Amino acid sequence: MRTRNDPNRPAQPDLLSAVLRSQLTELNLPFIRDHSHSVAQTAAEKQWSHLDYLTELVAGEAAARTDRRVQRRIKDARFPVLKTLDAFDWNWPTKINRLQVQNLFHLDFVAQHANVVFISGTGLGKSHLMTALGHAACLRGHSVLFTGAIDIINTLAAAQAAG
């Protein structure tokens, strides 16, 4: 390995690694920074081409960024507890329209700029279903805010009072 300044002098691997790590940090490429060595070892063992090695690193970086975006959306949504549709007990309440609820998870209402409101008595699973629906939306790249009607009314009243 040669340095850029003096092509006849070997580069110092530790210094080169430190410079590369610093540049990858500056470029905000943490996956590549943290995994380039292990992926390089795998590439050498499996005799990957340079393009295969680069493709693996970039794919890993892209996947890591997607995961971080999803986690940020979930955090920003302020779900009280994370719930999924799979965990919902369809045996109670007995009069719920399962197909109608499951169709909401296609998220067609988002593209139509429509709202979804669940109205029922206490303890019938409204919060569970809305949390699961919001979670599904976060996974598909949508921003969500989980809040109750009282909080919305209080926020609107405070905004109106502030002018």
Kindly give the residue locations of the regions a language model identified.
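N-terminal alpha-helical segment
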Residues: L16, V81, A149-I152
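Charged, compositionally biased N-terminal leader segments and the immediate start
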Residues: M1-F31
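Short hinge/gating elements
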Residues: V19-S22, S38-T42, A87, N115-S120
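Conserved, well-folded catalytic cores of nucleic-acid-processing
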Residues: L27-P30, V39-T42, L57-G60, A64, ...
